[in-house]
Amino acid sequence: MHFLKLNVKKTKEIVFDFRRKNNDHDNVVIGSEEVEVVNNYKYLGVIFDDKLTWEMQSNKVCSKLNQRLFFLRKLNQFNVDNTLLFLFFNSCIHSIYSFCAIAWGGNCSKKQKSRINGVIKSSDKMIKVEQLSRFENVFLELCNKKLLNIMKDPTHPLFSSIVHSSRNVNRLIHIKLRTSRYLNSFLPTAVRNFHQPKSK
């Protein structure tokens, strides 16, 4: 028995329904109050909507990137050392588009990826220390690291979803897919690119 009490006014309900036709859902009722239904929600700094398009999240990321790019340009105008520019990029720019990218990066639209890569390209021209990886490659690298961590942890919920080939234990069996949304998500992408050579 527990004595957990929910504040209905601060509680939100979001329904993930990918069917083409809009279907009515019964609202959640706590006590005598209905919980408010929302189309999007921000959780731990990540915004997701009821269709998992990640449009609001990617828009937020692009907005922040443009703000930080302004400061990078100012530092470059002041002839700050390239090493320090690179440090600023990793701390204040790279950290923005890599944060939780495993969740939203795969299904981010081409337009938004292009905007992110535009910021990376502009930064690359100013820093000139080393070639900066495109967003797509950063996403794949993060997926690969996460996959390796899962494979080492039998207690991870996704551990059983990773199936090794019976012919070669070093190869993974591709996951069966039905939707492009799942195709571009973390686990199928990580498995698909597990044996691919890394590229910049």
Segment roles from a protein language model:
Residues 12-17, 22, 60-64, 113-121:
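Structured, non-transmembrane catalytic/binding cores
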Residues 4, 70, 74, 98-102, ...:
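Charged/polar positions within long, soluble alpha-helices
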Residues 107-200:
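Short linear motifs embedded in intrinsically disordered, charge-biased segments
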